[in-house]
């Protein structure tokens, strides 16, 4: 089962030049194990971006992503406090 909801970005920090850690706040009830993924809606993009879940707790989801193409190149600019539509509990 999956859930569509709006999630608030708590942090979005570089780990390397192309790898980032993003922590989002919101409902995590449909996540059951690390390795599942979320689909993040990005402005101006038809397709959502699938990103693997690194960790989660009752209110936050930690995502690790690599900037590879035009879609993920937008993600480092997603600032703390911003809100984005996501599908969770996938995979």
Which residue stretches match the model-derived regions?
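Ferredoxin-reductase
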Residues: 2-82
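Residue-level recognition of conserved beta-strand edge/terminus positions
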Residues: 41, 87-88
